A protein has these predicted regions:
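Solenoid-like repeat scaffolds
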Residues: 75, 161, 201-203, 232-240, ...
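TPR/TPR-like (Sel1-like) alpha-helical repeat modules
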Residues: 81, 88, 92, 103-117, ...
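Inter-helical turn/loop elements of alpha-helical hairpins
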Residues: 63-68, 87-122, 133-146, 179-188, ...
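Amphipathic alpha-helical repeat scaffolds of TPR domains
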Residues: 45-53, 81-94, 120-140, 164-182, ...
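Residue at a conserved register position within TPR or TPR-like alpha-solenoid repeats
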Residues: 57, 91, 134, 176, ...
Length: 531
């Protein structure tokens, strides 16, 4: 059986370049640029172009289009069992998210059973179908982390069983990265996957999945710079895929390259809009808004807020859509220090509790920092309720993230009430808890880093030296943030450290000096002019 796979591969695993040309000729559409894949299979020659396209789309997380194409393959060749693997894999959605709703998972289980009934023609195809089946086994009884671990373990077996098949290695690597715990500061799983993918990148420099998954493997601040090569290549490899245009900004955001991030997401959002992919467009818009606000491009960020206000996410919409719709307006208020605006934000209805928490966190900060702690207290209580609900649902990561928010919000409420020692104690607890894990890949960054908030509080408490240390600590994790740079410059100036003040204010002007007017930018200019 193994020999048959290797003999079949040159005949049946077409390169995407050939497949795309055939597909474009058949549809009279301009050729897509999705990269080059060569996926061995035993399906009919008539469906090869579509099958290779479906795999390439999957590698670029274009799930709706990929699933549709795999279904067309199965319709064109009812004996093509591997197409059922593709459909079930697309239903998982973003490998780094929490998986589909139960109703969709049941659809995947049904299509897997169909694949088993069809009967895989090769051992490799049977392994692929059974591997994705491991993800859906006892679906409702397991956590997302447990399901992904099962999928990763299954594909590790597949990769070992077929050591000469690079596609198995590539899929195995992305699933391994997806098991990376956000509180593991060694990044062991992600770096192990990256080592596999770096070898594949040399062999397959135009493969969309390799570049894409390398970015995910390095999407953590301490190792993000290692992903710059893949980030710069991926958009060139698959410019027709919205996610390929967006994904480089994960690395650009981690290293604080805001102009690059903004450009990536402008392109991604445009392609997503043309492709009628609202989820991809919103995810790009959240990253875009984050970048704009660091560059003080406030009018551009405001446009994204207005666009988001006109969108309603269905209850069954991907979690990322719910996240972006909550995050964009909250970022716009908080990043600009528009505290009264933040206090007036309205929580959206959502099944995704941690996205509702974003709005309550922004509201609490806004009210407390507008000297209205009484108004903030109900939002702090709501954050506590959400954290407990997530904990009860065994969603430990997001429960902890919301607890970080609750502590930070409670700190500012205490500060507004005049309980400054208690406030600083709570704010330090928030910052220390936040450092124990990384931000989620659904987000360009937390709404505001806890160490940055600690710096703000220390400044208001007349402790600029301690504030400077807090702002600098914040920049270790989140470099080149506007508010951290300004805060560090201000803290350095007030503590008599002229060199550091000039350093941070100069960086702020270089980064955001051509943006929209902000009083912080003008204050930095005045300091530099006089010092």
């Amino acid at each position: 059986m193994k020999t048959r796979i290797h003999l079949a591969a040159p005949l049946l695993a077409l390169s995407l370049a050939t497949a795309t040309a055939a597909w474009a000729q058949a549809t009279s559409k301009p050729p897509e640029q999705l990269g080059i894949v060569s996926f061995a299979n035993s399906c009919a020659p008539a469906v090869q172009a579509s099958l290779q396209r479906a795999v390439a789309l999957l590698h670029s997380f274009w799930f709706g289009e990929s699933e549709k194409t795999f279904r067309e393959v199965l319709e064109g060749d009812p004996a093509c069992a591997i197409a059922t693997w593709g459909i079930a894999t697309n239903i998982i959605g973003n490998t780094f998210s929490e998986g589909p709703l139960l109703a969709r998972a049941k659809q995947a289980q049904e299509i897997i059973e169909r694949g088993r009934a069809i009967g895989a023609k090769t051992e490799r195809e049977r392994y692929f179908i059974e591997a994705v089946g491991e993800y859906y086994d006892r679906y409702g009884d397991r956590t997302p982390q447990q399901r992904m671990k099962s999928l990763s373990n299954a594909f590790e077996v597949v990769a070992k069983r077929f050591p000469d098949d690079d596609e198995t290695k590539i899929f195995s690597a992305v699933y391994l990265t997806a098991t990376q715990s956000l509180d593991d500061k060694t990044f062991a799983s992600a770096l192990k996957a990256a080592a596999i993918l770096e070898i594949q990148f040399k062999k397959h420099p135009d493969h969309p999945g390799v570049a894409h998954y390398l970015i995910h493997s390095y999407d953590y601040p301490p190792i993000a710079a290692k992903g710059l090569n893949a980030a710069r290549r991926y958009a060139e490899i698959a410019p027709s895929a919205p996610h390929a245009l967006h994904m480089p900004s994960h690395i650009f955001t981690r290293v604080g390259a805001w102009q690059d991030s903004a450009r990536s997401n402008e392109r991604s959002a445009a392609v997503a809009q043309a492709a009628k992919d609202p989820g991809g467009g919103l995810h790009a818009s959240d990253y875009m808004a984050y970048a704009y606000l660091q560059l003080a491009r406030d009018r551009d960020a405001r446009r994204l807020v207005e666009e988001a206000q006109g969108i309603r996410a269905a209850p069954t919409a991907p979690r990322g859509m719910h996240y972006s719709l909550a995050a964009i307006p909250a970022r716009y208020a908080v990043e600009r220090g528009a505290w009264q605006d933040a206090a007036q934000l309205k929580p959206r209805e959502s099944r995704v509790l941690y996205t509702i928490a974003i709005t309550h966190f922004a509201r609490a900060l806004g009210a407390a920092r507008s000297d209205d702690p009484a108004a903030a207290e109900s939002d702090v209580q709501e954050l506590a309720r959400i954290a407990e609900a997530l904990k009860a649902a065994k969603n430990t990561y997001w429960s902890t993230e919301v607890e970080v928010q609750r502590l930070g919000a409670a700190a500012w409420v205490a500060y507004a009430k005049g309980n400054r020692d208690e406030a600083l104690k709570l704010m330090r607890a928030s910052a220390e808890l936040e450092t124990k894990s990384e931000k989620s890949t659904v987000s360009p960054g937390r709404l505001v880093p806890a160490y940055e908030l600690l710096g703000d509080m220390l400044m208001e408490n007349g402790k600029p030296g301690e504030a400077l240390a807090a702002y600098e600590q914040s920049q270790v994790q989140d470099p080149n943030r506007y508010r951290s740079l300004y805060g560090a410059g201000q803290a350095a100036a007030q503590s008599g450290n002229r060199d550091k003040a000039r350093y941070y204010f100069s960086r702020l002007i270089d980064m955001a000096g051509s943006g929209d007017p902000r009083h912080e930018t003008e204050a930095a200019r005045r300091y530099l002019a006089g010092n």
